[in-house]
């Protein structure tokens, strides 16, 4: 389950970061975040073991930290849901556009930029497409039982695995094309950045943005505790041990898949990588049919995944304003307002990497790092000033500083540009 949650489209966003970090150092940073992920999840698991009964993460937090912290967590979860919906919509719209360009207009408009200027950004094309697609999303989100969309998890994993295989199999040919057409021996700027970490610390401070992106890639904590709750209820005597082993295995698997994606995406084009490898330009202006299929596949998987982020948001708002009761009027009004508002933002602001920096820097560090560790420390009923507890708080503090700095740097970049 953890692997399923982490194995999202963010896995394809790291090639551009490898150019500034250096491939080796990005892998090191990914490893560190993977270790942090395991540490903070197991802290939440240990905190949950002290609860007699729980159904979700917020109940664990209230049990150990009180109602105030549960409200804080719910606030961040609402922000997280809104941000993810906007991020996914900002990705879905251009993915469908790239699919249309690659499949039907490749001869007339060789690049997506050409297609965008000539067709895609024309109001008479873009506006109806956005309205219709968002309307279909609203219909999907009106469903009250999330279990009816369980198939979306399988579509998502299948889309990611398929795309990963395409990138892996084709990266050798793309790297060869890069060496023959872009690599210049005398020009070091065209060389692959294997180990130079310095570029990540230049004026744009890409290190902090890259780390915030990694925090988002591993943001899975709230979603796994309902699964763990059921496991604990069924296996009360060995729940914690099994949870920790499952978390370790899933973290190793997720990190290994991230490694494969980072390496193969980087080798696809070390000199001019796209924000997402699925945006890559085909060799010799060919159609790259397998990646065309991948774009459509991922766009569809994201479309069916979005309700999974919307349902908790709707429930949180209903709990806050209607006592948890979701009437038909509330359901229809809130669904259409939320979906169209998020779509409007996504149609104007479509910087995927910046969305990931904001989510990781301002939200994930709190719901995935600070709150689980605090719940664990309070569950021990020991002074927070005890040396081992203090070390954990310092580690969390460093992660929060890195994340928030990444978010602030991203804001500064947006203001400049």
Predicted regions: what is each one?
Residues 1-16, 37-42:
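Membrane-interface "cap" regions at the ends of multi-pass membrane proteins
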Residues 17-47, 54, 58:
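Extracellular loop-to-transmembrane helix junctions
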Residues 32, 36-40, 160, 364-371:
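Alpha-helical transmembrane segments and their membrane-interface exit regions
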Residues 42, 48-74, 86-129, 153-156, ...:
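Membrane-interfacial loop- and helix-cap regions that link adjacent transmembrane helices
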Residues 1-4, 29-33, 212-213:
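Alpha-helical transmembrane segments of multi-pass integral membrane proteins
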Residues 15-21, 134-156, 230, 344-355:
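Membrane-water interface regions at transmembrane-helix termini and the short interhelical loops
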Residues 1-9, 79, 394, 398:
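Membrane-interface recognition of transmembrane alpha-helix starts
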